[in-house]
Amino acid sequence: MLDAFSRVVVNSDAKAAYVGGSDLQALKKFIADGNKRLDSVNAIVSNASCIVSDAVSGMICENPGLIAPGGNCYTNRRMAACLRDGEIILRYVSYALLAGDPSVLEDRCLNGLKETYIALGVPTNSSVRAVSIMKASAVAFITNTASQRKMATADGDCSALASEVASYCDRVAAAIS
């Protein structure tokens, strides 16, 4: 796992060069946007249960066969596993946002996820749909446009961080499908 700082150091070391120029400017921007980044992570973490349960509910509303006998969310145990997986995915998305780097998401969450879902018979199209609902909710909370809750946010535009979270969710969807 690399954070924004480690990534710059590794890249500079590979070039046998000092950290400077555009790398240094990128780190300055990362630090300047630190409060917005922390507030964005907090918006996701504070609303994680809501984000995940809404995503799973939306997925089921669009595919009621999931809760019918034989469906992948039929029985409390399977529903709990589905909610747990959603929480884990969202947690790693928040870790990536905090670090400013997707490697933690890639290495510890997405590596082998599709193969695991296929082995368990989890319908990937439904999982991708749940991730897209989580993406929309997380972006809404970061940009403070979620209809049910308004939070104090850092001054300034958080659209870049919302786009960053959206890109991490897109990585999850691509890894599953």
UniProtKB/Swiss-Prot annotation:
InterPro entries, sorted: Globin-like_sf (IPR009050), Phycobilisome_asu/bsu (IPR012128), Phycobilisome_asu/bsu_sf (IPR038719)
Domain of life: Eukaryota
Family membership: Belongs to the phycobiliprotein family.
Positions that bind phycourobilin: 50, 61
Residues the entry annotates as binding (2R,3E)-phycoerythrobilin 2: 158
The protein's assembly and partners: Heterodimer of an alpha and a beta chain.
Post-translational note: Contains two covalently linked phycoerythrobilin chromophores and one covalently linked phycourobilin chromophore.
Physiological role: Light-harvesting photosynthetic bile pigment-protein from the phycobiliprotein complex.
Cellular localization per UniProt: Plastid, Chloroplast thylakoid membrane
Record's keyword terms, sorted: Antenna complex, Bile pigment, Chloroplast, Chromophore, Electron transport, Membrane, Methylation, Photosynthesis, Phycobilisome, Plastid, Thylakoid, Transport
Residues where N4-methylasparagine is found: 72
GO cellular component: chloroplast thylakoid membrane; phycobilisome
Organism: Porphyra purpurea (Red seaweed)
UniProt lineage: Eukaryota, Rhodophyta, Bangiophyceae, Bangiales, Bangiaceae
PANTHER family for this protein: C-PHYCOCYANIN BETA SUBUNIT, PHYCOBILISOME 32.1 KDA LINKER POLYPEPTIDE, PHYCOCYANIN-ASSOCIATED, ROD 2-RELATED
Stated name of the protein: R-phycoerythrin beta chain
One GO term (biological process): photosynthesis
